[in-house]
Amino acid sequence: MMKKKLFFLLVFSCLVTAACAGQETPPETQKSDIPDTQEAESLGAEDVELSGNQVQEPAEESEAGNVENYEGVPYRLYPTSENAWVGDVMPMADENGLQLYYLYDTDHNGVGYHPIYKFSTSNFYEYQDDGLVILYGSSAEEPDLAIGTGSVLKAQDGRYHCFYTGHNDTFPDKGLDKECVMHAVSEDNISWTKIPEDTFYAAEHYSGDDFRDPFVFWNEDEQCYWLLIAAHDEKLGGIVARYTSTDLSKWTLCDPLYAPEKQYMLECPDLFRMGDYYYLFYSWDRVTYYAMSNSIYGPFAEPADNILDGTGFCFYAAKTAEFEGKRYLCGWMGRKSEPKDTGAYDWAGSMVIHELVQKEDGTLGVKEPSSLENYFVVDKTPAVMGTAGDVEKDNGVYRLSAGADDVALAEFGMREPTMLLECTVSLDRDGYAGFAFGAGDDYGKYTGLVLDAKNNSVHFEGCVLSRIAYVEPVISTHFTFEPGKEYHIKLIMENEIAVLYIDDTKALSNRIYKSVDGAVHWGIFANNTEAAFRDIVVKVPAAE
């Protein structure tokens, strides 16, 4: 998948900002004490009123009270290159670990752009920056003046092979196809040699401007290589085209593997087997999807909910690799042109990796990489620092109750720069609960990461808690909530990045800039529901 240059011209935040500012102010939320029926304990701060209810602007544009300095940390969980951004990821595992090739994107791309760079890891919290792998073409006459997504494999001949997209915006003016499939080889996965004679273009009934993202693998049953390509068929629309080869040089066109006749393109296709099912991942319109089948030949069908993370470039172009017996889904979370919580995500940003979980019915879920339990080893579970609204604590369970015009909140002090928050949450009716971020005791200006039982979703909009019922989310993902049912939550934060996992089923990858820019306190909240938060634990990495 290629980033189009028009992305550099987009500015996103106006509509959501206006929506945040234009709602009627709800009644003031009242203060309450937080009795503990098991023991009399100090809560570390006096209860304070939920102030700031006259504020109508979004949280990140409101004035922060009691601002405290936040000291950031290096990105160890969600890497990106210095002075650049991570674009489409092309994962491949070998005896040296998980090799994470990616499109290297900058804000100052020249005529040529998107070389392939690489990170590598064996534990998902220590990444080695291996630098440049394949450079784009050196002249406007070369088909890979820009490079698009591809794949890397260690083939039957013992060599490493990279198939990638050649993209040249000037070619259509010369009567040539804009995109093609190109081939490079390496003996050591360090030095690469391009093979120009292996370059090939789209078949006649496929668009020459949309022929990209080659994915190559060895099919043991057929004793040949399969090549999947994101293509646009003149009759079927977006398809996953299929080719076969015995030598990785000459390719034979076969019938499409998947043609749902829904999207214009099915970018970044990725096919693998897990258990009794085959899974096909693809991306379009800022979202990563998957389909599944009992056979590698299909037919592939979308499950009822085939999105594992959020919308809007918060997790895109994801492809998979198996490493040490587990399958990982590797994509990127977009950056924003301005660090505003209400702003939209742009193309390319930070690498995000989820571990895939197979459910009993064959559908997939996601969780954090299991190895992170070796990273978050120090308990830093905090005490309550303050509350607002109807909050009670009983034997380690926080019960928050609020009406439609109220917010209940328990605040736990300053967040850790890198932290794992784990708990279970239940909601008794169709309302809102979740995790709040703000400046000290200025609770009226807190913003929230929302578990939305009314609309069956998890989302973030960057506005004050009293506005969450009225504002369109910046990003969201579907999740069905049942009244009274407990859900297991893990929230991993590293600087402004916050990735929430729920029940090993869904993730929402997100950037909460306000949580590192003055509003560095965190808490839990409820609105128009009674919510119970149990077994809250916070862990951080060991000091280095």
List PLM regions with ranges.
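Flexible glycan-contacting loops in extracellular carbohydrate-active proteins
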Residues: N510-A532
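Extracellular beta-strand elements of beta-rich domains used
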Residues: R534-V538
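Beta-rich carbohydrate-recognition and catalytic domains
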Residues: A21-Q23, P27, D47, G52-D213, ...
